[in-house]
Design a protein with these regions (language model features):
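Peripheral, non-catalytic segments flanking oxidoreductase cores
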Residues: 1-313
Length: 313
């Protein structure tokens, strides 16, 4: 178990002013240090999580030919199915040992090229509804966390609201299949940083997630039962000029004796609308911390990163 702070989300969502201030302080300390926290008492339904994992395992258990029918050209994996070995970490040509399914915003802020229709699975009638319900719950928790982040950054509490309402967030169900041959240099997910503002991860089905701490040591992360793992992504790191850390992480292969087991993971990547500028906040720039990143919009940054990880040509 890694020493990732476990925060009581109820302090923020239901607490007194003092408790809210305590939560903001704890959140800020963690995000400016290692960029990861776990939260408890968050309100995400355990029944919703269990149903989601059940539906995901049902889908990935379908025949390859059936799954392939839901892999849609031209969407860069942003909706529907992406087959095994298509994605790789930035700067690493070895393919990740995974397949995945992505669901996007059911209520887009506007009509734009980044928004695509979600895909239904004919063989699993309740599949889309399960994902929509989880998406909406996780989006709500994420938006509340962004309010706490805004307070820590001395911004208006609703600073992020207009940018994330109807934003381009993604719920991704990932299946890491059993390893049947020597994987060589490939791992289940190569070391990387997330693209988005923050990521919310419900309990994965097996060990394997590791985070690179500031001492350059890999530490294993296991979600405490009933908690969500929430980490900073590159967009928030850029916006805060590196004040908040988008930490490198990976999913390593299991010990050889457990190669025959699958691993499932379902992260929610909270994205803003594509129009949001990721220009560094003025109060995060100083003589000691000069501006570190070029100005770019969230949409253009996403496009750039999708190319780097092999999902877009």
């Amino acid at each position: 178990m890694a020493s990732i702070p476990n925060l009581n989300f109820a302090k923020w969502s239901q607490g007194t002013e003092n408790e809210k201030a305590e939560f903001v302080k704890e959140l800020g300390a963690a995000y400016t240090d290692i960029g990861f926290i776990t939260i408890r008492n968050h309100g995400f339904g355990e029944d919703v999580q269990d149903e989601l994992y059940h539906k995901a395992s049902e889908f990935f258990g379908l025949e390859k030919s059936i799954k392939a029918a839901y892999e849609i050209d031209g969407l860069a994996g942003q909706r529907g199915y992406t087959s095994f070995g298509k994605e790789h970490a930035k700067g690493n040509e070895a393919a990740d040992l995974k397949e995945f399914w992505q669901v996007g915003q059911p209520n887009p802020a506007y009509e734009g090229p980044e928004y695509h229709n979600n895909v239904s699975v004919g063989e699993l009638p309740e599949f889309a509804l399960s994902f929509k319900l989880a998406y909406q719950q996780l989006e709500g928790i994420g938006r509340e966390l962004l309010k706490a982040i805004a307070v820590y950054l001395e911004l208006d509490i609703n600073y992020f609201e207009s940018w994330v309402q109807g934003g381009n967030s993604i719920l991704r169900a990932i299946h890491y299949p059993p390893i049947t041959i020597d994987p060589g240099n490939s791992v289940r997910a190569g070391q990387h940083e997330d693209i988005n503002l923050i990521t919310l991860l419900m309990g994965a089905s097996a060990e394997g997630l590791q985070v690179l701490n500031k001492n350059n040591e890999w530490i294993g992360i296991t979600a405490i039962p009933g908690s969500l793992v929430v980490n900073v992504g590159d967009m928030l790191q850029r916006l805060t000029n590196g004040v908040m850390k988008s930490t490198t992480h990976r999913v390593v292969n299991p010990p050889r004796e457990t190669w025959g087991t699958s691993r499932y993971s379902i992260p929610f990547f909270l994205h803003p609308v594509g129009k949001m500028p990721l220009n560094a906040l003025s109060n995060c720039i100083s003589n000691d911390r000069p501006k570190a990143f070029e100005d770019i919009t969230a949409g253009n940054y996403l496009e750039q990163r999708l190319i780097e990880i092999g999902l877009k040509k």
